[in-house]
């Protein structure tokens, strides 16, 4: 049985984490190939892991006031796992190949958490039979933290839409976990949620725009030739193509506004000292200059021509995507 999980038996919790991360990377690559994922792939998983770790490292001195070094080390491992794992499973609703793909909100995240925890529980069981130290295993609480953190990344449409001061368009998306006033199991969920939508604030305008185009391509894989080679699809009328591209362009711009407008609410669950660190040291690009750059670079006005929109989506920044 143990040969299924390792070639060499883990001799520490760190080695257990390495086994889990190896499993996650293998599964993400498989899911990417099976489902033609241009955004929710290993690049995104590694980016979220990196951003989550950056958040953790920045606030670690503040956390160390109430946590031991051993606790922080295990917490960092959980953050790395959750950042890597959070989009491992992608579940699309059935649709024809020439229509946009849709997901049921929360289903992919739930399936991801279930799949990961099944593996961890099997790994725990396999190591238990080897009479390994209990500290090598993922505790029940740590498993709860992992589930909580993956569920924290669920995005839904804001039912208030543009009626609230913090939103700008009728199909606004946000992560309700960050707005839930109930006490969290740990900070891991909030860290992963912030990292997941943190491309603009942490990585800057170019990374944010590239992510937006990749999201569009993943939801509309039949437009691959448009994004790669600037070829307008013959199956769509020009006005339909323009409307689809313009809608996504506006979404990219409006979401940038929202990332900035929602930020203070989304970090409200952190201690004041940590909030100041997040503002000044981590989300350094979440400012009006970045918003203005996005508005300038992304054609989002009704007057934008079809050729201008195609030129934007068929950008050199996207030439390196894996097909």
Model-predicted regions and their roles:
Residues 48-55, 105-126:
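An active-site-proximal "capping" alpha-helix that borders the catalytic cofactor pocket
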Residues 99-111, 208-219:
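Amphipathic alpha-helical scaffolding segments
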């Amino acid at each position: 049985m143990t040969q299924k999980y390792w070639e060499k038996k883990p001799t520490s919790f760190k080695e257990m984490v390495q086994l889990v991360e190896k499993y996650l990377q293998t599964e993400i690559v498989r899911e990417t190939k099976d489902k033609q994922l241009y955004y929710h792939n290993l690049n995104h998983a590694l980016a979220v892991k990196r951003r989550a770790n950056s958040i953790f490292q920045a606030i670690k001195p503040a956390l160390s006031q109430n946590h031991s070094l051993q606790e922080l080390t295990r917490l960092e491992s959980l953050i790395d796992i959750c950042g890597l794992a959070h989009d491992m499973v992608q579940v699309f609703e059935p649709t024809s190949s020439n229509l946009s793909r849709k997901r049921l909100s929360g289903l992919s995240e739930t399936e991801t958490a279930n799949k990961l925890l099944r593996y961890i529980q099997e790994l725990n069981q396999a190591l238990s039979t080897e009479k390994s130290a209990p500290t090598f295993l993922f505790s029940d609480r740590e498993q709860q933290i992992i589930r909580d953190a993956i569920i924290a990344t669920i995005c839904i449409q804001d039912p208030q839409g543009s009626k609230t001061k913090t939103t700008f368009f009728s199909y606004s998306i946000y992560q309700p976990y960050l707005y839930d006033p109930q006490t969290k199991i740990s900070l891991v969920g909030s860290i992963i949620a912030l990292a997941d939508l943190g491309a603009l604030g942490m990585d800057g305008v170019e990374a944010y725009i590239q992510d937006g185009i990749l999201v569009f391509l993943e939801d509309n894989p039949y437009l691959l030739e448009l994004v790669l080679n600037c070829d307008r699809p013959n199956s769509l009328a020009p006005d339909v193509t323009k409307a689809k591209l313009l809608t996504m362009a506006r979404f990219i711009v409006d979401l940038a506004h929202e990332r900035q407008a929602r930020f203070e609410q989304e970090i409200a669950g952190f201690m004041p000292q940590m909030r100041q660190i997040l503002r000044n040291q981590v989300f350094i690009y979440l400012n009006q200059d970045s918003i203005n750059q996005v508005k300038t670079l992304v054609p989002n006005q009704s007057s934008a021509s079809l050729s201008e929109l195609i030129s934007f989506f068929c950008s050199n920044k996207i030439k390196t995507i894996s097909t």
